[in-house]
Amino acid sequence: MKVADLEKEVQKQTELRVMYRKRMERTQDYLRYCLQIAQENGILEHIIHSKGELQHSPLSVYNVSSITNSPRIPTHSPKHQHHPNLEAIIDQAKINGWYINPTEIQLEDKIGQGTTAEIHRGTWRGFDVAVKCISPEFFRTNANGVEFFAQEVETLSKQRHRFVLNLMGACLDPPNHAWVVTEYLSTTLKEWLYGPGKRRRDRIVPLPPFKERLTRVIEIAQAMQYLHEQKPKIIHRDLKPSNIFMDFNLHVRVADFGHARFLGDGEMALTGETGTYVYMSPEVIRCEPYNEKCDVYSFGVILNEILTGKHPYIETEYGPAKIAMEVVEGKLRPTLPSRDDGEHLGELIDLIRLCWDGTPSTRPSFDTITRILKSYTNRVLH
């Protein structure tokens, strides 16, 4: 076996160890939750004081539930027995009240289309909601499709931040009813900046005022700081304007956690080429180990885009593959705004350069980014 093959195998085994460790941690969390339910409903106390009886007639969760009139912990559907992560999430959703039956949702107009899902406006229990319907084809052609879906739902279900998309519930029955139900938001950062449609050089809508754009940037940084400072930290891995939604008051919601990854302190990820090339960091393109600083790179591209009002690399005729090659070699970054455009952008330009630096350790944390942006706003705009 060649050295390169051995290295790939080592990387693969390392990735598997990390994945199984995370699954074990999630299972332990779920078991602790079950123990808490048992204690709160007197089930554990009943078992402890009935040990002699248990030798002859073991009490199941169902027996004890009927004795105490407490809620039963849901059983697993045989349909999902090969996907323990999804089973655990279904149980948590039913216990915590965010499991949604597809018949409860009235699907309305399609408002978005991605490579793996359609987004519909809908109504659920009187609320306007957005329903992300994962394509059944995605599960048929992707061996890890159920895991990706389970991860997105699990990640969203744990987030409580005003600038992170709010999960209302989910239909957890892939492949036909893998639906993520969230608050309904009418536009994205991409549409706010450029209007509807594909990338183009010419503007079709006015560029929003500088102060409003800067406010949106700070909100994105705050959302990402929240995600990165969780334990374990959450790496988004696909941060871009089309994955950042906006409410009626134009406040942002960071969304689409289908590529998100949990990392412990000091831990590195190995899965390469995750995300969109235009916003992807060099180390991810090269399939090298990476950490949360890959999101900082993406943010740097977005910050530059918001300041210039131009799509990254729109001035070139390069396709995604060419852009990726030039970025990896350090030859290409989006065109920076001019320092003499009257907005005192020198400090922000320096921040952009740090964010998309080729060396991940040079890039600032989102804590630092947020403080720099707030300080700049207070000095320049107030």
Predicted feature residues:
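Protein kinase glycine-rich loop
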Residues: 108-115, 119
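Short beta-strand micro-motifs within the conserved protein kinase catalytic domain, predominantly
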Residues: 168-178
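Catalytic-loop of the protein kinase fold
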Residues: 231-246
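Regulatory alphaC helix of protein kinase catalytic domains
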Residues: 149-154
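Glycine-rich ATP phosphate-binding loop
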Residues: 120-138
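Conserved catalytic-loop aspartate of Hanks-type protein kinases
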Residues: 295
